[in-house]
Every structure is written in structure tokens, then in C-alpha cells.
From Swiss-Prot:
The active site is at residue 175. Binds 1 FMN per subunit. This is Dihydroorotate dehydrogenase (quinone). It catalyses: (S)-dihydroorotate + a quinone = orotate + a quinol. One of its GO terms (molecular function) is dihydroorotate dehydrogenase (quinone) activity. Monomer. Belongs to the dihydroorotate dehydrogenase family. Type 2 subfamily. It comes from Vibrio vulnificus (strain YJ016). GO terms for biological process: 'de novo' pyrimidine nucleobase biosynthetic process; 'de novo' UMP biosynthetic process. Keywords: Cell membrane, Flavoprotein, FMN, Membrane, Oxidoreductase, Pyrimidine biosynthesis. Its cofactor is FMN.
């Protein structure tokens, strides 16, 4: 009820202004009596995945807390894991505004943010100050002005800097809002990137005395053959996990709606069916050998259960959280 009232106010604002205001308020109120409005004590539903123990299988997807400013707030809401980022080596402002749109009737969101963030060094300082008990994922990407043929260098820079502080590292090669980025999902380009990442992982494991798993985040807009090839690359390179999926460029489910024609990636309920199908295809190809984190349209317990029945070991929420608030996490975890 309280969240519905707050949402009504936030939804009167431009979508990005509402997002920024929410982040400011979470930073301001966490640790004060006001955080009782969103702090939740949830039952333990422990899951072993990627060599880590998650207190429950419901996580916050990357993109909401790009700079790691509100880890404590999301931890207080009971998430089993929180994925911050996407972060790049250098700060960048992202694409021109407006770049975030709500499709309220479909409970969807279109964004073309473009990896706006304050840079990896800023994120690390925020992580070092935070106190939390959930698993922390850090999602890394490349700067827009880094040529795609040198993209691996950006991932390696970020990986080296976040490794010490991450529970796992998510490698984002599937955002539709950075030109050319999705080409890294295919063939030799993917294999070359994964080889470099695994080499760096081994080097950093020796340096820090701990193994931090790597998860690859993929797009929903892939053919069955492309998914099969990605799976072979994941297996061959011993990648620890796969996150399925990022946002979609397809507009079939929202055709004719206000903002449907806006460029960018579509998330939320319109993505649920396709992202779940990708999870199912991954499970078939990977045969349980590599864990799957299912994301895309998880806006209820039933949607989360669909992802898990399709083969997801963990699930993440983002758009569903925007529309339903912390109560969504509670509803999923309590019913598992």
C-alpha cells in the first residue's frame, strides 16, 4: 500500500528524474528510522550457485544502482544478491536525454541510457564504505569511445579493479545501447574475449587468494544457433555462469503503445516470455553444467517460478521492482 502511494508520486515525474530521486532518498534514509518502510526480514531460502551461497535466489539486476550508491538499502530489502553497474573504466554521461520511458500499460520500460556512470574508481569507493550481507555482483562494460576491437581492454581494466570487492563479476556484452557491443557475443570475438577474461581471472585469483566467478550477460535477440554457439564458448572457456537476458529490441508485445517507437532496450513484462525461452534453450544446451541467472519480466512469484522451471538457478528483478516495489521480493521469497 505504501509503495503504491509512493509510486503514484514518482510516476508523475519524468522516468529518469524519478529514478535519480529514488536513489537519493535510499542514500539519505538507509540507517535511519525511515528505512523501516522498506526494510524486510525474509525467510532464508539458501541457494548454492557459482561456488557462492546466496541467502535466497532473488537478486536486483544491474542498471538500477549503477554506481553502487545504495547497496545497503537493497540489502535491507532482503535481496539475496545485488548487482551494481554497469560500470566502465572511465566516467561517461551516456546518451542524450530523454532516454528512459515507462510503458505503464504493459509494465515495461524502454531505456537507451548508454552506460552512464561515474567510473569504476568511484564505484569501488562506494563499495568499500558499504555494510551488507548479501552477495554483491559487479557488472562491467566498455566505454562508448573505446573501439570495439579494443573492448577487451576495458573489461580487463574493470575486472582488475573490482575483483577484490566482488562476489561475482558480470560481463555485459549485450546492451543494445552501446554501438557494436553485441558483436562481442559471436564467434571468434566472443572466444577471444573469454580467453582474456579467464586468463585475468587466474592471475587475480593468485594475487588475491580468492576465486571470483565470471558470469556472461547475453541478449534475448539471438537465434537458436547463436545461443548454441554461445553455450559452446561458455563450456570451452569454463565460464562460471550466464545471465539471461538483457533488454530486447523487439517491439511485438508493445506495438502501438505510447513510447513503443522509442529507440533502446525494452524490459519488463513484455520480455518475460522471450527471456524465459532463452533460459530454457540455455538449460538444454548446458545440461546443468553452468548456472543460469534468469532476468527479464520477473514481476511476480509466478514469473519467477516460470524462470526457475525453465532452468534458472537464480532470478533477478528490475522493471518488476519499479512497478511493484520491495513487496515483490518478499512475495517471491516467501512463496518459494
Amino acid at each position: 500500500m505504501l509503495y503504491r502511494l509512493a509510486r503514484a508520486g514518482f510516476f508523475q515525474l519524468d522516468a529518469e528524474k524519478a529514478h535519480d530521486l529514488a536513489i537519493q532518498n535510499f542514500k539519505r534514509f538507509t540507517g535511519t528510522p525511515i528505512d523501516l518502510f522498506y526494510r524486510q526480514q525474509l525467510p532464508n531460502r539458501p541457494v548454492e550457485c557459482m561456488g557462492l551461497t546466496f541467502r535466497n535466489p532473488v537478486g536486483l539486476a544491474a542498471g538500477l544502482d549503477k554506481n553502487g550508491e545504495c547497496i545497503e538499502a537493497f540489502d535491507a530489502m532482503g535481496f539475496g544478491f545485488v548487482e551494481i553497474g554497469t560500470v566502465t573504466p572511465r566516467a561517461q554521461s551516456g546518451n542524450d536525454k530523454p532516454r528512459l520511458f515507462r510503458l505503464v500499460g504493459a509494465e515495461g520500460i524502454i531505456n537507451r541510457m548508454g552506460f552512464n556512470n561515474l567510473g569504476v574508481d568511484n564505484l569501488i569507493e562506494n563499495v568499500k564504505k558499504a555494510k551488507y550481507s548479501c552477495v554483491l555482483g559487479i557488472n562491467i562494460g566498455k566505454n562508448k569511445d573505446t573501439p570495439i576491437e579494443k573492448g577487451a581492454e576495458d573489461y580487463l581494466i574493470c575486472m582488475e579493479k573490482v575483483y577484490e570487492y566482488a562476489g561475482y563479476i558480470a560481463v555485459n556484452i549485450s546492451s543494445p545501447n552501446t554501438p557494436g557491443l553485441r558483436t562481442l557475443q559471436y564467434g571468434e570475438a566472443l572466444d577471444e574475449l573469454l580467453v582474456e577474461l579467464k586468463r585475468k581471472q587466474a592471475e587475480l585469483e593468485e594475487k588475491h587468494g580468492k576465486y571470483v566467478p565470471l558470469a556472461l550477460k547475453i541478449a534475448p535477440d539471438l537465434t537458436d544457433d547463436e545461443i548454441s554457439q554461445i553455450c559452446q564458448s561458455l563450456i570451452n572457456n569454463k565460464i562460471d555462469g550466464v545471465i539471461a537476458t538483457n533488454t530486447t529490441l523487439d517491439r511485438t508485445m508493445v506495438e502501438g503503445m505510447k513510447y513503443a517507437q522509442e529507440a533502446g532496450g525494452l524490459s519488463g513484462r513484455p520480455l518475460q516470455s522471450r527471456s524465459t525461452e532463452v533460459v530454457r534453450l540455455l538449460r538444454k544446451e548446458l545440461q546443468g553444467n553452468i548456472p543460469i541467472i534468469g532476468v527479464g519480466g520477473v514481476d511476480s512469484y509466478v514469473a519467477a517460478k516460470e524462470k526457475m522451471l525453465a532452468g534458472a538457478d537464480l532470478v533477478q528483478v528490475y522493471s518488476g521492482f519499479i512497478y511493484h516495489g520491495p513487496g515483490l521480493v518478499r512475495d517471491i521469497v516467501k512463496n518459494l
